[in-house]
A protein has these predicted regions:
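N-terminal helix initiation/capping motif
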Residues: 1-43, 115-126
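Hydrophobic core residues within well-ordered beta-strands of beta-rich domains
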Residues: 15, 36, 62, 74-76, ...
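C-terminal output/interaction extensions
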Residues: 15, 88-126
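Short, conserved beta-turn/loop elements at beta-strand boundaries and strand-helix junctions
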Residues: 24, 45, 83-89
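Short strand-loop-strand
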Residues: 24-58, 63, 95
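Short beta-strand-centered aromatic/proline hotspots
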Residues: 38, 76-83
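A generic structural motif
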Residues: 42-44, 82-84, 100-102
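Short, charged beta-turn/beta-strand-edge "cap" motif at the junction between a beta-strand
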Residues: 67-71
Length: 126
C-alpha cells in the first residue's frame, strides 16, 4: 500500500509550444533585474511549472508572461514555491504560485484568469 497522498486539488494541464518569460524585479537601485524564459511544463489556474537554465530562488516574486503559440501573452504575478535541478538534462524546474486575482492593479487581473480558464477547458487531459 502506497503512503503517497495526492495534495493537488486542481488538474494540471500542458499547453503545447507555450513558453514562460519571467522577470525578477531588482530590490535595490544598483541591481539589475533578472530576466529569463523557459518551457512551460504544466499549468493550473493557480500556478505554473516551467523549465529553465537559471535557478530562481524560492520565495522570489516574479512578473510572468505565458506566451502561447499564437503569440498571445498572459501576464501574471506569482511567488516561486520551489526549484529543483533535474538529473536528466541539468535544467531547473521552477514552480510559481500565482497571487490572487482582483481588480486592483497590484494583483493578477480577472482577464488573465479568464484566459487561464479558457486554456484549461481546451487542454485539460492533454
Amino acid at each position: 500500500m502506497s503512503s503517497f497522498v495526492e495534495r493537488r486539488i486542481l488538474e494540471r494541464f500542458h499547453v503545447p509550444n507555450a513558453i514562460v518569460k519571467y522577470k525578477l524585479e531588482a530590490l535595490f537601485s544598483d541591481q539589475l533585474p533578472v530576466e529569463g524564459k523557459g518551457e512551460l511544463i504544466d499549468l493550473t489556474v493557480k500556478g505554473v511549472r516551467f523549465e529553465t537554465d537559471e535557478e530562481i530562488k524560492a520565495g522570489s516574486r516574479l512578473n510572468i508572461e505565458i506566451v502561447l503559440d499564437d503569440d498571445e501573452k498572459i501576464p501574471l504575478i506569482g511567488n516561486v514555491v520551489w526549484t529543483k535541478r533535474l538529473d536528466i538534462n541539468g535544467k531547473i524546474n521552477s514552480v510559481v504560485e500565482f497571487i490572487d486575482f482582483d481588480n486592483d492593479p497590484e494583483f493578477n487581473s480577472y482577464d488573465s484568469l479568464e484566459k487561464l480558464e479558457a486554456l484549461e477547458k481546451e487542454y485539460r487531459g492533454y
